Structure formats: C-alpha cells, structure tokens
A protein has these predicted regions:
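Catalytic-site microenvironment of enzymes
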Residues: 1-237
Length: 237
C-alpha cells in the first residue's frame, strides 16, 4: 500500500511539473484586414441577433494609414517580445492581404489554442478630431456566454490598460464592458480588446505611425500581459 501511495505521489508530482513547464499561450488578434466583410453572424451562441463580420476599421486622419496595418505592426512587435519571454503565441493573421474572417472565427482560434489570454488589438476613430486616449474593452457578464470568463477578462483588462497607458502616455479612457461584441460572446477564454489611441486625432495618428510609439505600444501590451500571467515583465524591455 505504501508503495502504491508513493507511486501515486510521484506520478502526481510529475504531472504537476509537466503542467508547470508548459508555456502559456496568448492569442494575438490584430483587428480587421485589407477588406471589410459585410456578411453577418450571430453575436453569441444561439442568438437571433446578427452583426456584420467586420466593418473595416478606421484610418489615420493625417497619415492615411489603415487601422488594419497599424494593428498588425504592433501585433508583430508584441509577438517577438512575448516569445522572448517564453510565451507561446498564436496569431489570427500575420499579413494584411484579404477579406476579414469575422469575429466568430477569431474567437474560435483562441478557443482551439486554449489561450490564457485572447488579446485583440485595435485603434479607435471618431467624428470628433479632439477625441483621444487609450481604453480597453472586456465582455460584460452574460449567463451562458461570458460568465465563465468575465472575472478573468476584467482583471486582464485592468492590468493591460494600466501598462499600456503608462507606455504610450495617452489619456486614460479607462475600461468598458460590452454585451454585443461577437468576438467576446463566442470566446471561451479570457478576452480583452485594446484601443491603442485615436487615428482620427492628428497627434495620436502621427505618433502611432512611428516605430518608436509602435514599440512602446508593444512593450506596454507585453508588460500587462505578462503581469496578468504572473510572469516577470523584464523581457519586454
């Protein structure tokens, strides 16, 4: 009996060690793509309410840079930093070259990867050119859709928002819950969406077009992500 107990203990410790040695997976989702996708999809499992897959994003008011290009540029920088920190990274796209896949498909990539965090990268737009700042969105509590990821998503949003604002220095617009984001409602893993800044604000548009600020954004996202995962952010630079 004692031998069986010891064997079970050894096997249990070995399994725990294997789990501890497995790097966490982060799915990075650079928002949008080359072309919008005006087909529709249900906003959540079993819902009769539908939204378009992808409206196409915004564009730099001064630079003319499409949001999809900015999102991807920051995402690729973030991938390098997270990999350096020992995190397994899955990207929803690595080029800006096609019609957007939509938000259910993006969430399913994160679900299949069993992501520790599904990090969606966007930039904002407004009819008011004075609108500025950084904010982070996360799923509202909805029974049957997000109740299993709500608390972790909210915690991730708080940590990543703080790190991103500190890195970019843009005004802090805080956190926002959303009930109608398809990519949130179909996600089975913690999920947040960051809005780096406003591409319709001349100052923020110019800054986000530079390598310096794109690197700052990636570093802020890296630090926030690693802190959420309980890891040291030193590899983020």
């Amino acid at each position: 009996m004692r031998r069986l107990v010891l064997l079970a203990l050894v096997v249990g410790l070995g399994a725990a060690a294997a789990r501890a040695g497995t790097p966490p997976t982060v799915v990075i989702d650079p928002g949008h793509d080359l072309r919008a996708n005006l087909a529709t999809e249900p906003i959540g499992p079993g819902s009769s309410v539908r939204k378009i897959l992808d409206g196409g994003g915004t564009r730099g008011v001064v630079t003319g840079i499409p949001e999809a290009d900015l999102n991807l540029a920051v995402a690729l920088r973030l991938r390098r930093l997270l990999r350096r920190a020992g995190v397994r990274v899955v990207m929803t796209r690595t080029t800006t070259s096609g019609t957007s896949m939509g938000n259910i498909a993006r969430a399913e990539i994160a679900n299949r990867a069993h992501a520790a965090l599904f990090l969606r990268i966007h930039a904002d737009g407004s009819a008011d050119p004075s609108a500025d700042g950084t904010h982070t969105l996360y799923p509202a509590l909805q029974k049957g859709w997000t109740d299993d990821i709500y608390a972790r998503s909210r915690r991730a949003a708080r940590i990543v928002q703080a790190a991103l604002v500190r890195a970019l220095g843009f005004p802090d617009r805080g956190l926002q819950e959303h009930t109608d984001f398809t990519g949130f409602n179909w996600s089975n893993v913690p999920v947040i969406l960051v809005e780096l800044g406003f591409m319709t604000n001349p100052t923020e548009d110019r800054l986000l077009a530079t390598d310096r600020y794109r690197q700052r954004a990636a570093q802020g996202l890296c630090r926030g992500t690693l802190r959420y995962l309980g890891r040291s952010p030193t590899a983020c630079g």
